[in-house]
Amino acid sequence: NTNSTAPVQVRGLSDVIAIAGGWYHTIALKSDGTVWTWGNNEHGQLGDGSNTNSATPVQVSGLKNVITIAGGGYHSIAVKSDGTIWAWGKNEYGQLGDGSTTDSFIPVRATRLTSISAVAGGGYHSLALKSDGIIWAWGRNNYGQLGDGTTTNRTSQVQVIKLTKIASIAGGKTHSVAIKSDGTVWAWGYNVFGQLGNKTTTNSATPVQVKNI
């Protein structure tokens, strides 16, 4: 495995319509609804049923009709056309959302949620946006990155409080961000470096509005 300072083409992969990255792995969605992954696989984040690294794309086991994807630190997330969420990889903090803390080398369904329009991955947490504009979150919550007003880890989904009419979501390592339909930006979680954008360096377990934007 050789590093490259210039772009190299991923071999054997075509008709790709979306791409996502984890910390050391990559996820691709093809137009036929299948998902392909490559890179580090120590926690099963490639979803091929093994924990063997792969330098070429492998198909995620048993996953079809996928419409959107996201990458977390060591886990992967997908939404199927029926609006259900599926996730695989590291699950130490419940970031797969299946109610357990057991890693999974194949996709497992995240419980409770349907009608999902978008997903995002953080370092050890996950976010989902429902078609009604509400955000749900699960996984590690040591800095309040789930936005439920606590710092309690969650193995199943909790609603991000005080936020409605959301249009877009994103996850950082230990914080989360959302855009409302009115164009305002909101953030929550770790803030020691000011990443919440609210003119403080105080962590927040509930969403705060990003200032001057």
Listing of model-derived features with the role each one plays in the protein:
Residues 1-6, 38-56, 88-106, 136-156, ...:
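Short glycine/serine- and acidic-residue-enriched loop/turn motifs that recur at repeat junctions
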Residues 12-15, 22, 39, 47, ...:
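Glycine-centered flexibility motif
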Residues 25-28, 37, 75-78, 87, ...:
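Conserved core positions of repeat-based scaffolds
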